């Protein structure tokens, strides 16, 4: 009888949060697995998971940087924080700079980076620096999460080096990150400090294993002069609560037209697709909302504001939460 009681108590301890009471990001997280599925971890289990992952910290966390310009638009030139490395590249201090940071399981050659690079170079002369952080390709999501602060610090150090030794302007600098890459961008901004990074764009900043109530450990509005978030899979792979000073909610921010309601990856990736289109076409009209709950509920009226999602002028005029109507296929923006 005692054995049965013990087994019942053990089972109760394991199922700490009943299924019907699980709130993603509040009392636990649905953490992505390598096969695309999600596994629930309550707060205790998540803490144990992170502790196990931290036991392997100290291993290599290589971060490399590849420069693309009008002179080399398709073949990135690796640059290091060394005088000759930068001088032997096509880096031009008179051109604005864009850092692009991939998320979990990504590489610098991924289509996300290719599309964002092409989008900016189609606009004119830019230094587009694509970041490759090797620990992102870990099979275990948690081990990549553990690498985020270190990767972000290295990106921040590179930004400082280019600013201090090669005249890169911080006033025209934008750092763009997707998913986990958004938080790498946040740590880069924290490393540079004092909101000296001009703009950070968080493309559906990852939520699993990040707490909204701990902005010092995620991308936050304090990491740059202006932080913009484009939130497309809120409450699942991305945050639902506003991350940026300007927080944009395409289709209400949870699921995207043309994506299955169960295909979180599709909605998560749409943030990249929308951003590329915003850079090249500036066609995402927005409706200002009283708060993010109204944006999620699509209860913001029908009057378009003067703000365009993803516009590079937003830093000087945008604050608040915006609902963004979108189409189910390209062009996704509804403003011509």
Regions inferred by a protein language model and the residue ranges of each:
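Catalytic His-Asp charge-relay segment
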Residues: 225-230, 247-248
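Active-site nucleophile loop of the alpha/beta-hydrolase fold
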Residues: 201-209, 231-235, 253
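Conserved hydrolase catalytic core segment
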Residues: 190-197
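Flexible, membrane-associating and regulatory peripheral segments of lipid-active enzymes
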Residues: 2-130, 137-147, 156-170, 193, ...
């Amino acid at each position: 009888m005692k054995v049965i009681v013990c087994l019942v108590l053990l089972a109760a301890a394991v199922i700490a949060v009943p299924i019907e009471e699980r709130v993603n990001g509040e009392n636990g997280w649905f953490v992505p697995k390598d096969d695309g599925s999600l596994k629930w971890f309550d707060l205790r289990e998540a803490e144990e998971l992170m502790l196990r992952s931290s036991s392997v910290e100290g291993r290599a966390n290589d971060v490399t940087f590849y420069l693309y310009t009008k002179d080399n638009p398709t073949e990135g030139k690796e640059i290091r924080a060394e005088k000759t490395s930068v001088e032997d590249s096509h880096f031009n201090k008179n051109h604005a700079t864009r850092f692009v940071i991939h998320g979990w399981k990504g590489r610098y050659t991924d289509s996300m980076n290719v599309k964002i690079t092409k989008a900016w170079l189609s606009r004119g002369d830019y230094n587009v620096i694509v970041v490759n952080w090797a620990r992102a390709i870990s099979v275990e999501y948690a081990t990549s999460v553990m690498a985020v602060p270190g990767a972000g610090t290295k990106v921040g150090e590179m930004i400082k080096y280019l600013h201090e030794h090669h005249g890169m302007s911080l006033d025209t600098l934008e750092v763009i990150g997707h998913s986990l890459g958004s938080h790498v961008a946040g740590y880069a901004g924290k490393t540079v400090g004092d909101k000296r990074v001009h703009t950070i764009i968080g493309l559906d900043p990852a939520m699993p294993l990040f707490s909204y109530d701990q902005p010092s450990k995620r991308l936050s509005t304090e990491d740059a002069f202006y932080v913009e978030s484009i939130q497309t899979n809120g409450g699942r792979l991305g945050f639902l609560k506003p991350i940026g000073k300007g927080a944009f909610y395409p289709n209400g921010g949870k699921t995207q037209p043309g994506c299955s309601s169960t295909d979180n990856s599709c909605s998560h990736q749409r943030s990249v697709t929308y951003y590329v289109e915003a850079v090249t076409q500036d066609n995402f009209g927005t409706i200002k909302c009283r708060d993010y709950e109204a944006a999620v509920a699509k209860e913001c009226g029908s009057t378009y504001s003067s703000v365009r999602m993803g516009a590079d002028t937003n830093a000087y005029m945008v604050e608040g939460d915006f609902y963004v109507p979108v189409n189910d296929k390209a062009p996704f923006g509804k403003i011509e």
